[in-house]
Amino acid sequence: MRRVLTSAAVAAALALAVTACGDGSGDAGSSPAKSAAPAEVSGTVTWWDTSDATTEGPVFQEIIKDFEAKYPKIKVNYVNVPFADARDKFKTAAQSGSGAPDVLRTDVGWVAEFASLGYLAPLDGTPAVDKPEEFLPVPAASGKYNGKTYGVPQVTDTLGLLYNKELLKKAGYDEPPATMADLKKVALDVKSKTGAGGLALNVDAYFLLPFIYGEGGDFVDVQNKKITISSPQSVAGVKIVEDLITSGAAVKPALQDSYTNAETAFKDGKVAMIFNGPWSNADNLGGKVFKDNPDNFGVAPVPAGSAKAGSPLGGHDYTVYAGSKNLDASYLFVQFMDSAESQAKIAGKLGLLPTRQPAYSASEATANPKIAQWAKPMETAVERPWIPEAASLFQPLVEGYQKLAGGQTTTEPMLKDVATAYQGILKGWSL
C-alpha cells in the first residue's frame, strides 16, 4: 500500500445531500436485517481493494479463492482501486447511488466521514463483526461512529524509521538515531562519509505527523474543538523538517510522486533512511540492496522530538456499502477476509500487521520476522481523531508542505494558512 493522502477534498463535500443510500444521519439501516444461513447465501460481492496491486493484491486474491471454495454460491468481483483515488471515487458512486462496491477497503480516517454521510451499513449484529473481543482496541475504535460499528479493522500500521544498516555502519553508527537531533547528525554523516543521501522525505501530510507529534503538536484538539495545527508545538515540529531540508541532511525532496522517489532511492541504496510503514516491507525487501541481504533492512521507532516519539496510527477497515444488494454475502465475505486465520496469512506473506491478537501468535505470522520488528514502532503510535472531517484535513497540509519543500514559504506562514483552511472545514472550531 502506498499511503499518499493527496486526493482533493473540500469541506463542501461533507454537506452533499445523500441520495438513495441514506439521509446523512449516519444511521442508514439502523437495524440490520437478520442474516440468512451462511450455506444458503448466494450472489456476487464486488470488492474494491485499495492495496498495492503488485505486491499485496495477489495475496488478497489468494484468500478470495479460499472464500469462494467455502461459499461456492458466492462469487467475488475483485477490483483494485488506487488508494489515492478511492476516497473520492467511492463518495461519487455512493452519492449517485450507482457503481459503488459492496465492500470497500477503507482507510481508517474515512470511516467516520462515510458513516456520517449515510454511505455505510451498520455492522453490529451481523457476521461481519465476528469475535470482536479479539481486536486490538485502537484499530477497532476507527470503525466506530456515533456508538455503532461501520468498519472492522483489516490491518493496522504506523510509521517507523527504515534504515540501511550497512550505510549507517560505514558512517560510524551501529544503531539508528533515537532523537530528531540525532537524525540530522546521522544523515549528514552518511552524506559526507558514504556519498549516499542521508534521508529521503515523502512530501505528504501523513509523513509530517511524527515531527508534529514529537513536539507535542497535532492537527486538532477534538475535546475542546480547537484547531492546533499552527500551535507553537506544531510549528516546532515542522521547523525540524524545514531544517532537515535546508541543511542538506535530507536530499532535495521530489514534489511530484515523492513517495515513489523516496522509496526507490532507499531500495537502491541511494539514501540510508526513510520514514515508511509496514505496508512497504515486501517492496523494500525486493529492492537491490535488500533482496539478497534482508538483514541489512532495519526498522526502528520514529526518532523522538522534545516531547515524545510519536507516529500516526493508520491502517484499513472493511466497510459495507449501505446500498448493497448483496448484504448477506458481503457480511460473510468480511467475516472470512478478516478472520484471525486470514490475517495471519496476510502477515506472513506481506508483513502487514494484524488487528486481531490471536493472529500475532499464529505460525504463519511468526514466520515473518518483520512482524516482530514492528512491535516497537507500534508502541509509539498515536490515535488519530475519528471525526467525519479527518480525511479533509490532509489536503491543505500537503499543499503547504509542498510549498515548504519547494522553498516557496517557511513554516509559520505555511501553518497559518493551513489553520485558516481548517476553519472552513471545521465549522465552529476555534484557533
State the predicted function of each range.
Residues 187-188, 226-254:
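Glycine-centered hinge/linker elements that transmit conformational signals in sensory
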Residues 138-141, 297-301, 347-399, 403, ...:
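Long, aromatic- and glycine/proline-rich binding clefts that accommodate carbohydrate-like moieties
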Residues 101-102, 130-168, 197-201, 303, ...:
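A structural signal for short loop-to-beta-strand junctions that line the ligand-binding cleft
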